[in-house]
Regions:
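Non-catalytic alpha-helical coupling and interface elements of nucleotide-dependent molecular machines
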Residues: 70-74, 159, 184-188
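Short, solvent-exposed secondary-structure capping/transition elements
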Residues: 74-82, 147, 163-166, 188-192
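Bergerat-fold GHKL ATPase/HATPase_c domain
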Residues: 1-122, 128-129, 148-155
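Acidic ATP/Mg2+-coordinating residue in the GHKL
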Residues: 140
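Glycine-rich G1-box
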Residues: 143-144
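Bergerat-fold ATP-binding/catalytic subdomain of histidine kinases
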Residues: 153-168
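GHKL-type ATPase core
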Residues: 5, 165-215
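Short beta-strand element(s) in the Bergerat
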Residues: 132-136
Length: 215
C-alpha cells in the first residue's frame, strides 16, 4: 500500500461515523481480517487488565482524553520556548505554565477576557457527529507525535512519558486508554491520526494513522 492509498484510506476512516462504516472500509482494503497487520496494544496480550480499569464512566474517560490534549498543547508551547519539559527550567505547575506560555495573570483562566479565552480554546476541539450513537472527535494543535513514536506514546501503557514534567496532568501514560471501554458497541474502535507539530522541528516524518480495536 503506497502513500496515496494510505492517505485515501485515512480520509475515508476520518469521515466515517459508524462502526459498520469503519469495518466495511477496512474489509474492502483487505485489512480487517488480516491478522498480520494487527498488533497487541503495548505489545502485551494482558493489556485489557490495565485498559479496562481506568475510568468507571464514559464521561470520565472522555475528560481524560481532553486532559491529554491540554498536556500536548502545553508541551508544544514549552518546546517552542526552547525549554526541555523535563528540566528544572520548565514550569513547576500548570498555573505557572499558563502564565508563561499564554500570559495569563496568576495562571488562572478566570483572569482573562472572553477574546483571549477563545483564542486559547482554538487549540482543542471536541466534535460530535452522527445520530443515536455519535462519533466523537478530539482534535488538538499540541505537540503531536510522529508515526515512529506512536508505539511509545498513543499505543503504550505505563511508559511514564510525562512523569518528569511538573506542569502536566496526565503523568502515567495510560488514562487515555480508558475510552476503549466505552467505544463502539462491538469492537471498541478508536482512530488515531497525528504528526509532529511542525513548529517543534525535531522530526521530518509525515502523518501517521492507526486503528485500535478490541478482539
Amino acid at each position: 500500500m503506497n502513500n496515496s492509498h494510505i492517505k485515501k484510506l485515512t480520509l475515508s476512516l476520518a469521515r466515517s461515523e459508524t462502526e459498520d462504516d469503519v469495518v466495511n472500509i477496512l474489509t474492502k482494503a483487505n485489512l480487517w481480517d488480516d491478522k498480520d497487520v494487527w498488533k497487541e496494544f503495548d505489545g502485551s496480550d494482558g493489556n485489557w487488565s490495565t485498559i479496562g480499569n481506568q475510568q468507571k464512566s464514559a464521561d470520565g474517560a472522555l475528560v481524560e482524553k481532553i486532559i491529554n490534549s491540554v498536556d500536548a498543547v502545553l508541551i508544544k508551547e514549552c518546546l517552542n520556548f526552547g525549554i526541555n519539559p523535563e528540566s528544572s527550567e520548565a514550569p513547576s505547575s500548570i498555573q505557572d505554565a499558563q502564565k508563561l506560555f499564554f500570559n495569563i495573570f496568576n495562571g488562572k483562566l478566570s483572569s482573562i477576557d472572553t477574546k483571549q479565552r477563545s483564542r486559547i480554546a482554538e487549540n482543542i476541539y471536541l466534535v460530535a457527529s452522527g445520530s443515536k450513537f455519535p462519533s466523537l472527535d478530539i482534535v488538538d494543535l499540541g505537540e503531536g507525535q510522529s508515526p515512529s513514536a506512536f508505539k511509545d506514546t498513543f499505543l503504550s501503557l505505563n511508559k511514564g512519558n510525562k512523569s518528569k514534567m511538573q506542569f502536566v496532568q496526565g503523568k502515567f501514560g495510560m488514562g487515555g486508554t480508558g475510552v476503549l471501554s466505552f467505544g463502539s458497541p462491538k469492537h471498541n474502535l478508536q482512530l488515531i491520526i497525528s504528526k509532529r507539530n511542525q513548529t517543534i522541528k525535531d522530526s521530518d516524518e509525515e502523518w501517521g494513522m492507526t486503528v485500535v480495536r478490541r478482539i
